Amino acid sequence: MKLFNPFYKKPINFHKKPINSRKEIPIAEVLNPLTTKQLVKENDHDQFYFRMLEQQGIVLNERQLEAVRQTEGPVLTLAGAGSGKTSVLTARVGYLINVKKVKPENILVLTFTRKAAEEIKERIAQLPGLSKNTVRNLVAGTFHSVFLQILKSQGYDYKILSNEKHKEVIIKRILKDMGLKDDYDPETILSLISYSKNQLLTIEDLPEQTPVEREFKDIFRRYEEWKNKEHYMDFDDMLVYTYDLLNENQRLLERLQERFKYIEVDEFQDTNIAQYRVLQMLAEKHKNLFVVGDDDQSIYAFRGASSDIILNFPKDYPNTHIVKLDVNYRSNPSIVGLGNEIIKYNQKRHVKTLRCYKRSNEYLTPFYMRPKDTADEAQLIVENMRSDVRQGTRKWKDFVVLYRTHAVSRAIVEQLVLKNIPFVVYGDKKPFYEHPIVKPVLDYIRLSINPNDLNALKSILPTMYLNRDKAIDYITTEMVFNPLDESETLLHYLLRMPGLHPSQKELIIERIRLLDDIKKMSPVDAIREIRQGKGQYEKYLEIDQRRSFTLQKEFANEMLDELVASAIPHKTHESYLNLIDKILKKHEEMEELKNDPYADVVSLMTIHNAKGLEFPCVYTSVDYPKLYIRLP
């Protein structure tokens, strides 16, 4: 399996060559671009600044130079991956101060992460002619941190509600008070509230045509009332409160507009409506708005980011100067070429093709895998890793597996556990088998083996349209005062519960029969019976309006399909559940390694969690039909 490619016309390296595959790998154009050393002449008025940059090892290419020099008016800088956007952002700040004689306090730099903000501040302070004292008055921070300072300047003294677990506890309490404890996922409710705020939608703006929509508005309203009562605000409130404040306080807005004559924004493709509206207000007077981003890297729509903002920027600002940073300094031509080949099929994008900076005559080529199913896929990846580690060319920490959703990681995790390979899953709060969609199905199987498993019973109660708390309280009381006969199970207690509708009793009887039936089946047949047969679990997910309100049908089907695939190799429930318990235990053990930067572990994460990170060896899923690519 040769991964080094010294030739441009190297055939594609396939694990299994698919029909009608192209013969050669897509290669990005390689060039050695002109730089400021050739482009900036000695008689140029700003040559002194670029000569100082060069002495510090900062050499800009033609497009980067264009972006730095274009200081007036709206500028859209389309920065492809690895094209040096941070160098441009920082060099441009230095240019404004050194060449244009702009005071640092008249410059605002906005980023999306604290780490990025700190890096930009540090780099600016190291620029020629500048120091930490010089840039002390420069405002550089995240949208939230800058907006928070604006709010504090006007007397806002709210406590910050930043802990996600704390917010979930609040929502759980609200749901319990409304008698909806088992009906909504708190995490999803919070995501919907956040999305609404990022779109600047108030509670009154939301629809209320169905009972579920009215319930959501009530949950939303109670959450806001709790925060106001306890004097809290969350991160989304910082955006909304700043937007409202600037709309209401014209004097403050004018003061900020006068101060921030030049505004720079990083990762502009991740901007949401609330952030953009505030940005437009701040830049309204001088319109010196410099935004850097890449619409091809817009992957946070589910959090409220809108790619339309970067796509329509030239329409919002008709005299926009567009600069395309199209030279990748990070990756080799075969990887950049692969990215170009895939992204060109996007319909909504600013047209651009990345080129490569020539650094060597030797190039690594992607290794393509075409597995037949998820199990084959996982085995191929894990064996590929083990081969490298055995040969001494890699360590476990060199590998990362990227995927679209955590459901896809199930088979990979299983193989890593079976082969005793250390791993850490980033970004997911629950393992696949503990997911709220998956767990009830498994608990039906657990109950078929042990009908008196109270923990398993808890998760299936909502599928019988029973209130979990009331049912468990009744059962635990009955277990003390009215023990069951030997032929009875916990489900028989439910038949005696007062206030049951005849249809509920019939459903409980059907579930007792179901448990008897699936006990004799293989795990995969049992799951199918629970999902689409007598268990009617899929129907339950569809007709439960509350669940369908917060759950995409495609996502639920993907999770359940993956669960079916996980059961295929097992002949007995015992072997299947033993493996699941082993995997869950391993997850707990591996969690302790998550915060250890020196741990030698394979990393697993979604593409969203991986943004901005680098690894020596990457496995990534393109999409169905399954195609895994190893990027060295």
Q: What are these regions, as identified by a protein language model?
A:
Residues 56-72, 274:
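N-terminal pre-P-loop "Q-motif" helix
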Residues 492-609, 630:
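Accessory C-terminal helicase-associated subdomains
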Residues 77, 83-89, 93, 319-321, ...:
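Helicase P-loop NTPase motor core
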Residues 317, 360-365, 393-523:
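ATPase/helicase motor core of nucleic-acid motors
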Residues 139-147, 264-267, 292, 405-407, ...:
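Conserved helicase core region in the C-terminal RecA-like lobe
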Residues 44, 48-52, 273-371:
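Conserved RecA-like helicase ATPase core segment
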Residues 3, 22-54, 73, 94-246, ...:
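A basic/glycine-biased coupling hinge at the interface between accessory DNA-binding modules
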Residues 258-273, 290:
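SF2 helicase catalytic motif II
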